[in-house]
Amino acid sequence: MNNVLIIGCGLLGSSLVRRISKKKIAKKIFVYDKSKLNLAKTRKLKLPVIIVKSLNDGVANSDLIIFCTPMSEYKNIILKINKDLNQKHIITDVGSSKIKSSETIKKNLKKKIFWTSSHPITGSEVSGPEYGKQDLFVNKWCVLIKEKKTNLKHLKFLGSFWKKMGSKIVIMSKEKHDKIFSITSHLPHLVAYNLVKSAQDFEKKQKFNLIKYSAGGLRDFSRIAASNEIMWRDIFFDNKNNISKAIDIFVKNLKAFKKDINSKNNKSILNKLIKTKKVRAKIIKLKQDINKPDFGRN
């Protein structure tokens, strides 16, 4: 690969820059970002990139194009770069939902140009190039989306690319992807936002100062709820059907917990708590986290 264009130099985009540069995967790294603040930070950090003022300039000089923006920006980006795309371009993204975004891309992408979607399962509640890390993708899953008309050469190339990023590769359909992550990612974020809002509402109604006592559960949820609001709005809207079903399951279980608490059903509630505790052990066994108490991030 000669050159890569990264559209959006925030947390993920800047982490890609750092990794690509360290591993010498591309000769040149072009970056486009409509945020003047992000560009100023990129310059200040002296990231090894060529900042392009025009998307078209970046596309014309690149082999690989990676969308690292909120998904609501995909359509406008495609419409701007369509005229400069050719069949040699490999185009992908890092978006967290796939059905709606893929439909939007395909509807607006010019004919005979292929879109192959990626989802590296990593991130943080913070955003901006100053938070990027070259090892952000190391030992993390990266989902590649395979469809009937997927260009297999592009899929193979992206598998190799993400392995160089340090990722473990899994291939699945966009439908399976959105169902899985509605439960493992999208619902937990929604619950975090709602829990923090509930604390705010309670604090306002009771006139208690709750926040200063947030050393336990609320603190952990508040970290998740600090995630980028535009990105998560897009995810909630794009994967609304699966998320709505996930909410139904959550509400059903919440009502069951409420019933057990009110009736002091010792056997039922202990059974639930023990079963759910086992999930944590399984996550550690699968090396998705470490068996170490977390009293605050470093």
What is each residue range found by the language model?
Residues 77-130:
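Rossmann-like NAD(P)(H) cofactor-binding subdomain of soluble oxidoreductases
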Residues 68-70, 95, 146:
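Glycine-rich, N-terminal phosphate-binding loop of Rossmann-like dinucleotide-binding domains
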Residues 49, 63, 188:
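Conserved acidic residues
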Residues 3, 28, 114, 141, ...:
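Residues at the starts of beta-strands that form the adenosine-phosphate
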Residues 1-60:
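NAD(P)+-binding Rossmann beta1-loop-alpha1 motif at the extreme N-terminus of oxidoreductases
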Residues 207-275:
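Interdomain hinge/lid region at the active-site interface
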Residues 134-220:
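Internal alpha-helical scaffold of NAD(P)-dependent oxidoreductase catalytic cores
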Residues 56-85, 89-90:
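Rossmann-like NAD(P)-binding element
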